[in-house]
Amino acid sequence: MADRYSFSLTTFSPSGKLVQIEYALNAVNQGVTALGIKATNGIVLATEKKSSSPLADPSSLSKISLITPNIGMVYSGMGPDYRVLVDRARKVSHTGYKRIYNEYPPTRILVQDVARVMQEATQSGGVRPYGVSLLIAGWDEGGPMLYQVDPSGSYFPWKATAIGKNATTAKTFLEKRYTEGLELEDAVHIALLTLKETIEGEMNGDTIEIGIVGPPADHLLGVEGVEGAKGPRFRKLSPQEIEDYLTNL
């Protein structure tokens, strides 16, 4: 029955579903596992960097993106769709919100804008839903925030969650290991242990990518002598830092 409605991008099936969104979720479920964990003093985003060829340069592969100095994003699904949404999020943050208010948008505002773009693709003719799910991590006045955005445009705040091929296994593991009052360092270790449960093959600094939202990194500010200036909270761990964490597992 669903096949009768799959030709239309915006027609509901009798069961109340938009079939194209189901197909978009299938694309997400075929992507590599990505996860996010919120701690008391930060957030961890982690994912597998899977190359289609051993000849590919691992340094050119990146799935975690900087949006603003305090917000980062990771995805599972179709890479080209993700890059479009990253460009949109950066444009809204830098040339839209900051130009008007002289500050970067709070995480929730940015999430709402990205979710609106994704939702519009489910009701407009001549387009298709974005084949990605996103995990967006940021630091606001209220502390660290972690959101998941799906192809339908729905978004939810999470303490810890996972998306991608082995999301169910990862979530089951996170439910067992996550505790209230978790520190950022412990969250990084749990993230690596979770990926270890879902990844087939070797884990090292070239096959794992980790981004953290934590205390201001003033050494990354690049500006000296500005009173009250704070460094960015979001940064990606270097391959060597990831290797050090893996050694201590």
Curated annotation (Swiss-Prot):
Pfam families: Proteasome (PF00227), Proteasome_A_N (PF10584). The 26S proteasome consists of a 20S proteasome core and two 19S regulatory subunits. The 20S proteasome core is composed of 28 subunits that are arranged in four stacked rings, resulting in a barrel-shaped structure. The two end rings are each formed by seven alpha subunits, and the two central rings are each formed by seven beta subunits. The catalytic chamber with the active sites is on the inside of the barrel. Keywords: Cytoplasm, Nucleus, Proteasome. It comes from Neurospora crassa (strain ATCC 24698 / 74-OR23-1A / CBS 708.71 / DSM 1257 / FGSC 987). InterPro entries: Ntn_hydrolases_N, Proteasome_alpha, Proteasome_alpha-type, Proteasome_asu_N, Proteasome_sua/b. This is Probable proteasome subunit alpha type-2. PANTHER family: PROTEASOME SUBUNIT ALPHA/BETA. The proteasome is a multicatalytic proteinase complex which is characterized by its ability to cleave peptides with Arg, Phe, Tyr, Leu, and Glu adjacent to the leaving group at neutral or slightly basic pH. The proteasome has an ATP-dependent proteolytic activity. It comes from the Eukaryota. It is found in: Cytoplasm; Nucleus. Belongs to the peptidase T1A family. One of its GO terms (biological process) is proteasomal ubiquitin-independent protein catabolic process. GO terms for cellular component: nucleus; proteasome core complex, alpha-subunit complex; proteasome storage granule.
